[in-house]
Amino acid sequence: MAHIARKRFGQHFLSDGGIIDAIVQEIAPQPGDAMVEIGPGLAALTQPLVERLGRLTVIELDRDLAKRLREHPQLEVIESDVLKVDFAALATRFAAPLRVVGNLPYNISTPILFHLLGFAHLIADQHFMLQKEVIDRMVARPATSDYSRLSVMLQWRYRMENVLFVPPESFDPPPRVDSAVVRMVPLAEPPAVDAARLGEIVQVAFSQRRKIMRHTLGKWLDEHGFAGQFDAQRRAEEVPVAEYVALAQAVPPRP
């Protein structure tokens, strides 16, 4: 019996052979890579990957799909919500930096990206299929309409690029949005910063993104003992990533 895509899992299965080949080419898997695939689904991407790798670890939440995948002798199947997976344990077991790939469920793609952010020091690279509008925000530059909290929180830790456009008809069932593939490579020497403090600052800044920050981030900085110079007569989208990082480094630590 054919598997029916489940809306609650945000399932849209890749079915275009040409697109699949293009994605595999961008990933460039090599035998022995410590690769982990999130959401393998019906194995459209899984099969060409494992043919090149020899072995592949996959994370699948859907019980029926996980059962099917276990029939493949070259796959290690982790039946779990990816947000509960300890990627540090996987990296330790592989004794190598992880390569993480996947057609991410669009309904929880941002939480997955933030979950992986905590393991970036253990990851060699990431290749994900996502909504194109999400990738546009991820790679956006300051002073553009797509520049957002997501832009800042990923760009301080990754070098990213949109490598492939994927139209809706490449999926079954077709989503109502355009998709794309993003490459994410963790920076070899990221700035030394408290990620939680940076996240707090960025969240406050973008809480009213169309207004100047005098009454949002400016007020927050005063309340947290910041004694440096910061122009709060700007909108959050006008502030470069490096300046947010510098703020997080300069604000006194919590008592």
UniProtKB/Swiss-Prot annotation:
Keywords: Cytoplasm, Methyltransferase, RNA-binding, rRNA processing, S-adenosyl-L-methionine, Transferase. Its EC number is 2.1.1.182. One of its GO terms (molecular function) is 16S rRNA (adenine(1518)-N(6)/adenine(1519)-N(6))-dimethyltransferase activity. It comes from the Bacteria. InterPro entries: KsgA/Erm, rRNA_Ade_diMease-like_C, rRNA_Ade_Mease_Trfase_CS, rRNA_Ade_methylase_Trfase_N, rRNA_adenine_dimethylase, SAM-dependent_MTases_sf. GO terms for cellular component: cytosol. The keyword Metal-binding does not apply. It catalyses: adenosine(1518)/adenosine(1519) in 16S rRNA + 4 S-adenosyl-L-methionine = N(6)-dimethyladenosine(1518)/N(6)-dimethyladenosine(1519) in 16S rRNA + 4 S-adenosyl-L-homocysteine + 4 H(+). S-adenosyl-L-methionine binds at residues 12, 14, 39, 60, 81, 103. SUPFAM superfamilies: S-adenosyl-L-methionine-dependent methyltransferases. Its main location: cytoplasm. It is found in: Cytoplasm. The keyword S-adenosyl-L-methionine applies. Belongs to the class I-like SAM-binding methyltransferase superfamily. rRNA adenine N(6)-methyltransferase family. RsmA subfamily. Specifically dimethylates two adjacent adenosines (A1518 and A1519) in the loop of a conserved hairpin near the 3'-end of 16S rRNA in the 30S particle. May play a critical role in biogenesis of 30S subunits. This is Ribosomal RNA small subunit methyltransferase A. It comes from Variovorax paradoxus (strain S110). The lineage of its organism: Bacteria, Pseudomonadati, Pseudomonadota, Betaproteobacteria, Burkholderiales. The gene is rsmA.
